[in-house]
């Protein structure tokens, strides 16, 4: 069984991709920025719930503050999507302009989320389709443009 994706993992991903914190460059994460990142994640997920509906994210209770060890409830495949979207928000908090590469990565991840959550409607015909004159398979009466079935016009032209 895979380890559940935590809120702290998403925030660390966003901080790392933004270049704000990284273990490779020994830049430690400030506790205040980490806490703000988790709160930003909660806000981001509330906004994404409007567009995508329920993705399975587990919001923290109103009485308690979210922590980094809380399970997010999201599948692991959404780590990059949420991380890149959170990264864009965090960069604006720090007054840093995102690079075109960061914006392209965030857009590609968001498009992947759109594709993954897309629900294709059934292509079967509806039962309440209107049947017009052209779709009517029974022949119309003599007062109509079409002749009745079984009626064969005889040659009434006197010349032939």
UniProtKB/Swiss-Prot annotation:
Keywords assigned by UniProt, alphabetized: Degradation of host cell envelope components during virus entry, Degradation of host peptidoglycans during virus entry, Hydrolase, Late protein, Viral genome ejection through host cell envelope, Viral penetration into host cytoplasm, Viral short tail ejection system, Virion, Virus entry into host cell
UniProt-listed GO biological process terms: symbiont entry into host cell via disruption of host cell envelope; symbiont entry into host cell via disruption of host cell wall peptidoglycan; symbiont genome ejection through host cell envelope, short tail mechanism
Protein's cellular compartments: Virion
InterPro entries, alphabetized: Gp4_sf (IPR038258), Tail_accessory_Gp4 (IPR020362)
Protease in keyword set: no
Protein name as catalogued: Peptidoglycan hydrolase gp27
Similarity field: To phage P22 gp4.
Function noted in UniProt: Component of the cylindrical core that assembles on the inner surface of the capsid during procapsid formation. Required for stabilization of the condensed DNA within the capsid; perhaps by plugging the hole through which the DNA enters. Plays a role in ejection of the bacteriophage DNA into the host cell at the initiation of infection. Functions as an exolysin that catalyzes the cleavage of the glycosidic bonds between N-acetylmuramic acid and N-acetylglucosamine residues in peptidoglycans.
């Amino acid at each position: 069984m895979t380890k559940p994706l935590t809120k702290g993992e998403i925030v660390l991903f966003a901080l790392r991709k933004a270049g704000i914190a990284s273990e490779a460059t020994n830049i430690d994460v400030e506790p205040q920025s980490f806490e703000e990142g988790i709160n930003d994640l909660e806000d981001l997920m509330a906004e994404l719930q409007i567009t995508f509906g329920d993705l399975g994210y587990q919001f923290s209770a109103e009485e308690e503050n979210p922590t980094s060890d809380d399970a997010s409830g999201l599948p692991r495949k959404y780590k990059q999507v949420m991380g890149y979207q959170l990264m864009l928000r965090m960069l604006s908090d720090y007054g840093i302009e995102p690079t075109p590469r960061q914006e392209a990565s965030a857009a590609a991840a968001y498009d992947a989320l759109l594709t993954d959550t897309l629900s294709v409607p059934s292509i079967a015909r509806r039962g309440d389709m209107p049947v017009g004159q052209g779709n009517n398979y029974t022949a119309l009466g003599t007062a109509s443009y079409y002749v009745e079935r079984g009626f064969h016009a005889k040659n009434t032209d006197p010349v032939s």
